[in-house]
Amino acid sequence: MENKIRVARAEVRMTQQQLAEAVGVSRQTIHAIENGRFVPSTVLALKIAHLFAKPVEELFQLEAGD
């Protein structure tokens, strides 16, 4: 799964730590999501999308083979 979390954070000048605290996960989890090593749960994806006021499908896209 591809995501645009890093881009969304940069747009609002938010750190990984700030995002992690806002959605209730560790900074390491945000790092892993941004680097494609962890696929967030539906609930976590919705929390992140809501925080950035963007549709989930704008932040997360399926890749071939997903």
Predicted regions and their residues:
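Short, charged recognition helix plus adjacent turn
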Residues: 50, 61-66
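Residues in the helix-turn-helix
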Residues: 18, 29, 58
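Short basic helix-loop element that most often maps to the first helix and adjoining turn
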Residues: 3-22
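DNA major-groove recognition helix of helix-turn-helix/homeodomain DNA-binding modules
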Residues: 43-58
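Recognition helix of helix-turn-helix/homeodomain-like DNA-binding domains
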Residues: 25-38
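Short, basic-rich loop-to-helix N-cap that marks the start of a DNA-contacting helix
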Residues: 37-47, 66
